[in-house]
Amino acid sequence: MAKRNVTAKKKVVKKNIARGVVYISATFNNTNITITDEMGNVICWSTAGGLGFKGSKKSTPYAAQQAVESALSKAKEHGVKEVGIKVQGPGSGRETAIKSVGATEGIKVLWIKDITPLPHNGCRPPKRRRV
């Protein structure tokens, strides 16, 4: 019988970071939350799909709220107390995600920016759906 090669999981090193940036990427299908330090190094992240929401439930505002709460609870373990928010995308979880960051106890929101890319008449958009 052959020996199985088992790799050990990486141990998460607790960082002591007081100020961070929350990136909220709200697409039509999912919501991604990434929390970084001020230099852009990722502290933790969470997605609606990663929390067990499948299919069309991933794009709901409730799923976005749960993703934010999951990511911020991980960030609090690293000592994050103040955050800025950068929002990208047109998804339905966008507003709810911003509100739930502000409502989280122990986290102070310093600023909110919209970083959604807008084309200056760039690529031709895809044709309209006919249902």
From Swiss-Prot:
Keywords attached to this entry: Ribonucleoprotein, Ribosomal protein, RNA-binding, rRNA-binding
Keyword match RNA-binding: yes
Pfam families noted in UniProt: Ribosomal_S11
Coiled-coil intervals: none
Alphabetical list of Gene3D superfamilies matching this protein: Ribosomal protein S11
A biological process term (GO) from this entry: translation
InterPro entries named among the record's database cross-references: Ribosomal_uS11, Ribosomal_uS11_bac-type, Ribosomal_uS11_CS, Ribosomal_uS11_sf
Cellular component per GO, a single term: cytosolic small ribosomal subunit
MF annotations from Gene Ontology: rRNA binding; structural constituent of ribosome
Entry-linked PANTHER family: 40S RIBOSOMAL PROTEIN S14/30S RIBOSOMAL PROTEIN S11 (PTHR11759)
Function: Located on the platform of the 30S subunit, it bridges several disparate RNA helices of the 16S rRNA. Forms part of the Shine-Dalgarno cleft in the 70S ribosome.
Family: Belongs to the universal ribosomal protein uS11 family.
Record text on subunit structure and interactions: Part of the 30S ribosomal subunit. Interacts with proteins S7 and S18. Binds to IF-3.
Protein name (database record): Small ribosomal subunit protein uS11
